[in-house]
């Protein structure tokens, strides 16, 4: 069996590291062909020494120069590239078999689209591709003959709970024809699901990044605390599974053992369960339609005391409601919301605004952008840039 060449867009981040762990557990099946990062020289250097990729690329030109010098000094033959164009070329490299698209934020958009346009098998962990590009992205997957597999634990759970006909028609699955009545998206509710609302004004960045169940980066941890993460996943799920608002349900499940579910018209509910470890969905997408060892502890049913479910409270999670409404408003609104949220979360982490200001800035940014029909990627980038400037101005006020 020939090894699969994997390109990891975002290898220095949380998902990237988990992907390398799966590769390490399956050295006979996978090879880390190219590793891509932002400007984290130290982590990339360590990864190059351990995994010996053909290529390593950093978005930051100066960081790439330092990395190149370090690798030469250690006699590591990995070729170092720099900048967005080089990253996009690696995402479409003819020798690449699978592309793990896990660069966080709008920065991951163009490299992910490059992989799609090269007809690659894309393991999608970058939320923004669908949140900002939606129909454009799904159409590109179809038109260029790419294969899309969802890595996010919730979407991967839904994917696994759907029939094979739906799995083969991502973005265009006729849910009702396949007997599906609802897609049930579960979320932990974050660290503040029981915190009294009057205490929200004094929530600190340290409290917000301490997620009870999952190990994640700071941005996604704050998004989990505001449930914007679930809002973005709602938008993604609607595009991935071609689901209407009526076919969607969002439930808070504090234990994060059930990762999402699918209701069928005959009364069945199929759920995917497992320990909260991203290596499971990563391994599932890498091996699909087969299975491979992920290095994850098996689920011990005797240790699970209970599984509980709570209806989401939009007073507690205004960002979740905002995301649902933004999808209904159109692509311009989800793009603006996503951009504003990136700026607002960073401002909160930098202690420039309060926890409750995040949702307010997101809403005000959408309200200041004129409704607009997005035709192409340039429109997306234009609205993204506009929204960021508006959000920055609101923060300064």
Swiss-Prot record:
Named cofactor requirement(s): Mg(2+); Mn(2+)
Binding site for Mn(2+): 152, 154, 233
InterPro entries: DXP_reductoisomerase, DXP_reductoisomerase_C, DXP_reductoisomerase_N, DXPR_C, DXPR_C_sf, NAD(P)-bd_dom_sf
Metabolic or biological pathway: Isoprenoid biosynthesis; isopentenyl diphosphate biosynthesis via DXP pathway; isopentenyl diphosphate from 1-deoxy-D-xylulose 5-phosphate: step 1/6
Reactions that this protein is recorded to catalyse: 2-C-methyl-D-erythritol 4-phosphate + NADP(+) = 1-deoxy-D-xylulose 5-phosphate + NADPH + H(+)
GO molecular function, one term: manganese ion binding
This enzyme's EC code(s): 1.1.1.267
The family this protein is said to belong to: Belongs to the DXR family.
Task performed by this protein: Catalyzes the NADPH-dependent rearrangement and reduction of 1-deoxy-D-xylulose-5-phosphate (DXP) to 2-C-methyl-D-erythritol 4-phosphate (MEP).
HAMAP family associated with the record: DXP_reductoisom
Protein name, UniProt field: 1-deoxy-D-xylulose 5-phosphate reductoisomerase
Gene: dxr
């Amino acid at each position: 069996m020939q090894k699969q060449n994997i390109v990891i867009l975002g290898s220095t981040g949380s998902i990237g590291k988990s992907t390398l762990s799966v590769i390490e557990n399956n050295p006979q099946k996978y090879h880390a062909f190219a590793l891509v990062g932002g400007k984290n020289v130290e982590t990339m250097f360590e990864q190059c020494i351990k995994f010996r990729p053909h290529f390593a690329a950093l978005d930051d030109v100066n960081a790439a120069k330092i990395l190149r010098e370090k690798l030469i000094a250690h006699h590591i033959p990995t070729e170092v590239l720099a900048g967005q164009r080089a990253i996009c070329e690696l995402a479409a490299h003819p020798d690449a078999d699978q592309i793990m698209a896990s660069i966080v934020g709008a920065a991951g958009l163009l490299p992910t689209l490059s992989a799609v346009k090269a007809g690659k098998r894309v393991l999608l962990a970058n939320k923004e591709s669908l949140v900002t590009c939606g129909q454009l992205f799904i159409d590109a997957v179809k038109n260029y003959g790419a294969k899309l597999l969802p890595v996010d634990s919730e979407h991967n759970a839904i994917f696994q709970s759907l029939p094979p006909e739906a799995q083969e028609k991502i973005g265009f699955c006729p849910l009702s024809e396949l007997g599906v009545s609802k897609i049930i998206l579960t979320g932990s509710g974050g660290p503040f699901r029981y915190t009294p609302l009057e205490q929200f004004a004094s929530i600190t960045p340290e409290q917000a990044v301490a997620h009870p169940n999952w190990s994640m980066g700071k941005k996604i941890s704050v998004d989990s605390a505001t449930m914007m993460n679930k809002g973005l996943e709602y938008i993604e799920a609607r595009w991935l599974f071609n689901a209407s608002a009526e076919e969607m349900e969002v439930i808070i499940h504090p234990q994060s053992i059930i990762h999402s579910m699918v209701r069928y018209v005959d009364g069945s509910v199929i759920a995917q369960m497992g320990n909260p470890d991203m290596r499971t969905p990563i391994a599932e997408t890498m091996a699909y339609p087969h299975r491979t060892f992920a290095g994850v502890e098996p689920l011990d049913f005797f240790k699970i005391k209970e599984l509980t479910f709570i209806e989401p409270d939009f007073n507690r999670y205004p960002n979740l409601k905002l995301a649902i409404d933004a999808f209904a408003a159109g692509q311009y609104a989800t793009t603006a919301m996503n951009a504003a949220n990136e700026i607002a979360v960073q401002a909160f982490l930098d202690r420039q605004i309060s926890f409750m200001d995040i949702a307010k800035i997101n809403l005000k940014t959408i309200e200041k952008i004129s409704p607009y029909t997005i035709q192409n990627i340039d429109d997306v980038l234009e609205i993204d840039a506009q929204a960021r400037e508006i959000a920055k101005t609101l923060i300064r006020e």
